[in-house]
Amino acid sequence: MLKTLSPSLLALALFSIVVIADDNEIYVDQSGATANIDLEQLGSGNIIGGLESTAGSLNPLDLDGSSLTLDINQIGSSNTFLGDIYGDNITGFFEFDGDSNSFTIQADPDNTYGVDSSDYNVNVTGSTNTFTLNHGTSALASQLDLDWTVQGTGNTLAYNINYDGATNYTDIDGDSNTVNFTGQGYAGGYFYLEQDGGSRTFNIQQLSTLDNDYLKILSNGTGGSVCIIQNDGGTSTGC
């Protein structure tokens, strides 16, 4: 079953959709400021596209404009959310309930706006999910506020932030979860990781070149590996 939506959302637009069934697809290509976009999928095997979408060859989810609010809810297993986001003052709420889901976002990969002053909240309940976030991949993204809340086992978080001052809070409950984080830029960043569960894997790099980085980890559990690198431009290091 295929459901395709391709709106042109203008200023002060409000967009909301609920899809109930398996193997649905949502296509959104939005341009314009101050849009409020709410997407919800219930069931398994669904896709919100962009990037390199599969199934019905979607592409994109492509959001261009400032002061946007994006609310994503995928409730079920084996769902996929993919997209490119361009613009300052982006507020994102992302909720995933289920197993084996996949989330991939690039924020301003072409250095169009700089994605300054963004606020992302990601809530995950389930296991063996994979999340990839590249924020400010070409440009410095100032004053990012990023919050992850993850409950489940075997999840992987991989995020790369090219930041100009950022706050990153990650709360994980469950065993065998992995955090791969790289923060780089000029104005430093704050990263607070709180984790409960065994067999965890942390690979954390803070690479601000002209300012201080701050890292706080509270971890409770047995087994696993932790690699932390803070480097402001000195000799190459590794674990």
Regions found by a protein language model. Give the residues of each.
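Long, low-complexity, polar and repeat-rich extracellular regions
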Residues: 2-239
